[in-house]
Amino acid sequence: MPRGVAVRVTTMDAELEFAIQPNTTGKQLFDQVVKTIGLREIWFFGLQYIDSKGLVTWLKLNKKVVAQDLRKDNPLQFKFRVKFYPEEVTEELIQEITQRLFFLQIKEGILSDEVYCPPETSVLLASYAAQAKYGPHSASTKARLTEDTNILPKRVIEQHKMTKEQWYERVSNWHQEHLSLSKEDAITEYMKIAQDLEMYGVNYFEIRNKKGTDLWLGVDALGLNVYEKDDKLTPKIGFPWSEIRNISFNDKKFVIKPIEKKAPDFVFYASRLRINKRILALCMGNHELYMRRRKPDTIEVQQMKAQAKEEKQAKKLEREQLAIEMKKRQETEEKYKRLQQQIREKELAEEKNREDLKRWEEESRAMQEKLKQQQMESEEYQSKVAAMEMQMNEATLEREMTAQEKEEMRARVEALAEEKARLEQSREESLKESAEFAEKLRLSQERERELQEAQEAAAAQHAAQLAAQREAQQLIPKDEGEEDEQDHELEVQQDDNDDLDDKESYLPDKHLLDKLQKLQSELQAMKDESKGEDRYDKIHQENIRAGRDKYQTLRNIRSGNTRQRIDTFENI
């Protein structure tokens, strides 16, 4: 048995290794990859490699892998990448895995500056990327976001006088706007905005016109566009697939025959034969998908869409159920917290009641002691009065007294009378004070009974709250194609639809749009003028001032007849 050849294929989020046979074709390897990752929308993708001359090349599916112009790596290195882009991501990308691979590749292109993105849009896209990666904004997701060192294009960071913390804060603020979005919906929102970027989905090739002017040819899902050498954002001339009859090349010369019979051929020159081969291969693939979109879906696509719709609906229901459960959990936890607070308040009230009761008991004992003392004083007073009366009686019985004795007796009687009056007054005061103390004692006893009753009621309420608390705790959920080298020509099938009639840039809701414009002003004020203005930033701002967006520009460059556009191209 022939010895196997080691192959490593890197997708956007995984690394796969295979051992293939020397006679394994590109298609067999491709099929093995898509089967391994569970991908069914295979028509958008291809296997990419660096050839022996250091150029990025697509693996030919109809040829043996080892017979192609590969570098002598061990294992052989390939990247599984998007080769053809859809016209509308929300309508054409069906499977979640397809959407995720597109999202990751588009994000990589923006962060690496392969695709130009304005600073304010970069921040918005970074917030959707954070939602797709971490989920809804929270303290923990914010902390994880600040650990992510690759959230914005390096160009954007270097052009502004802002710290990393300031950038993270702005992305985090936007992230908070997406709380209700699922990770899948965040990916969709990211791609809807990204597909409006001028360089999205365009493959650029260096070409020359007959005058020898260096230009860019852009091949995308809608047709061919020509750009000046220093501006990949704003195409100057466009040829939709619906206006092209035939595409072919001979050596370095590339010829496009328009449908308009009186129009001359659109001719340009590439620097290498292999570049013309790649241009033709991309034209063939893009045109095939262009025509497929304008036909009824195949049974396979219909099945995929139905399955994706069911899965999306099931996930939506699951998210809604989860949201309900989370709301219930939150309400239960809040109820639990309120009960705990009420229990704490009751415990404090009970403690105060106990202290009040203790104080009243002490006051009651003091009053009882005082009352007892007053009773003793009253008894002593009664005893003194009786003794005085006895002495007075004895005095009246004296028959014979001297004048001096009579005077002494009279003084003594007066003193006794005064003492009696004083004791009588003291007795009345004591009786009055005793009555007051008795009333206080009665009130104290009533207060004591009230406190005891309140304590018993609080204890009963406490028991009821503890039972409710246990019930609340039980309610809380537990945490949880390939060009044939001999075929240098493409006959283009026709379709009369104008692809850009209703196409408009995707705009977020007004709130986000206003916030985006505010952020644009903030970032403009923070520009580091010492770095100079980026060429593409300048072009982008000029386009905005002129009221041009991607689709308005494409409509403009397709206006007029084909002959006029070809003449314009020749005269650049």
UniProtKB/Swiss-Prot annotation:
UniProt cross-references to SMART domains, sorted A to Z: B41, FERM_C
Keyword terms: Cell membrane, Cell projection, Cytoplasm, Cytoskeleton, Membrane
Entry's localization field: Cell membrane; Cytoplasm, Cytoskeleton; Cell projection
Biased composition range(s): Low complexity: 454-475
Positions of the FERM domain: 1-294
Stored PANTHER family: MERLIN/MOESIN/EZRIN/RADIXIN
Entry keyword RNA-binding: no
Record-level Gene Ontology MF annotations: actin binding
Bias (Basic and acidic residues): 525-544
Region feature (Disordered): 444-508, 523-544
Function: Probably involved in connections of major cytoskeletal structures to the plasma membrane.
Record organism: Lytechinus variegatus
Biased segments, Acidic residues type: 480-502
Pfam families xrefs: ERM_C, FERM_C, FERM_M, FERM_N
Name of the molecule in the record: Moesin
Transmembrane segment boundaries: none
Record flagged with keyword Membrane: yes
Gene Ontology CC terms, in alphabetical order: cell projection; cytoplasm; cytoskeleton; plasma membrane
Membrane topology summary: Peripheral membrane protein
